[in-house]
């Protein structure tokens, strides 16, 4: 065996990091859990604390849309779609109308098991989406 191969296979074998040094609050949480009588009472508390925040944010985000003016309501989703297009391919956001992308549920058809918004598996040079992802017209025909 080549000694360089062994180094490449396990480059972190010589590194040892104690858990207490990673997060000081983690050590405190681990000490509290065994001292409590049941761990099931301790675990739902963080989940219950975390769940209301996103629900409140979603309700706050969704509430102005239906109550707002139709012109404002129509422009907000289009702006969100344009923001989504620019990270995938900044060159195509101005060339294609926003109607070619879908919002909400993905379309039903071939390739639905593929991640729809993946930008790292190009199927063509214009949109950089997976094959048959149906995000853009060029993906549908390829």
Swiss-Prot record:
Residue ranges, annotated region (Disordered): 28-95
Low complexity composition bias: residue spans: 64-74
InterPro entries: UPF0574
GO BP annotation list: biological process involved in interaction with symbiont; establishment of skin barrier
Subcellular location: Cornified envelope
GO cellular-component term (any): cornified envelope
One protein family per Pfam: DUF2477
Gene Ontology MF terms in the entry: identical protein binding
Comp. bias intervals (Polar residues): 80-95
Primary site of residence: other
Family under the similarity heading: Belongs to the CYSRT1 family.
Described purpose of this protein according to its UniProt entry: Component of the stratum corneum that may contribute to epidermal antimicrobial host defenses.
Assembly and binders: Interacts with components of the late cornfied envelope (LCE).
Name of the featured protein: Cysteine-rich tail protein 1
Lineage of the species this protein comes from: Eukaryota, Metazoa, Chordata, Craniata, Vertebrata
Gene that encodes it: Cysrt1
């Amino acid at each position: 065996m080549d000694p360089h191969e062994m180094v490449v296979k396990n480059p972190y074998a010589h590194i040892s990091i104690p858990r207490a040094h990673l997060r000081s609050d983690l050590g405190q949480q681990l000490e509290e859990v065994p001292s409590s009588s049941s761990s099931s009472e301790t675990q739902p508390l963080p989940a219950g604390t975390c769940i209301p925040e996103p629900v409140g944010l979603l309700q706050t985000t969704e509430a102005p849309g239906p109550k707002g003016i139709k012109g404002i309501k129509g422009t907000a989703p289009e702006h969100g779609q344009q923001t989504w297009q620019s990270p995938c391919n900044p060159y195509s956001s101005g060339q294609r109308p926003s109607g070619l992308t879908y919002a909400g549920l993905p379309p039903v058809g071939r390739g639905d098991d593929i991640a729809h918004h993946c930008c790292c598996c190009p199927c063509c040079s214009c949109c950089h989406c997976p094959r048959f992802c149906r995000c853009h017209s060029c993906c549908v025909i390829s």
